[in-house]
Amino acid sequence: KERPNLHIPPHCNDCGLSLGVVEFFRQMFNQEIFDSSGFPFWESDISPSNPTDKTIKETAEMLAQGKIIGWYQGHGEIGPRALGNRSILMRPDIKDGKDILNSRVKHREYFRPFGASVLLDNVSDYFDWTGETPYMLYVMDVLDKQSFPSITHVDGTCRPQTVTEQNNFYHQLIIEF
């Protein structure tokens, strides 16, 4: 399929409006509006540390066993999707995975779709897509719908995120899994 070269920013919903206003006033007054030293509500509560190789290996093993994981690392994210820093992770091949997450974890409607994270080098192995989609904003066909029921929406599509070494620890976790 031929697709247009289109860039969609990760904050294409209402949260992007406030960023636009802040940037407008920053330029208007030619000064920084906020101190960029950290997130004011959490920075003092959390001692930053990176996942160790052991943590990544153990997390990958738990995912392989079918456990649902809360993954919290790195900087916070903006936009409508969790992108590997504040994410709920689960195997994509669990038959009732969508139902489990929607009813027991997220407490939302049964029909809500899920995204998937895939290494950029492997995206065309699983989806009708080539190239980057780092923010889960493009809908594409899942190539093997039967093998990945947890990420396949009722219409056979998914909104995957391509992951690169730019998100080093999440990238390592996917490789280990």
Task: Annotate each PLM feature.
Residues K1-F177:
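Flexible beta->alpha loop and helix N-cap segments adjacent to enzyme active/binding sites
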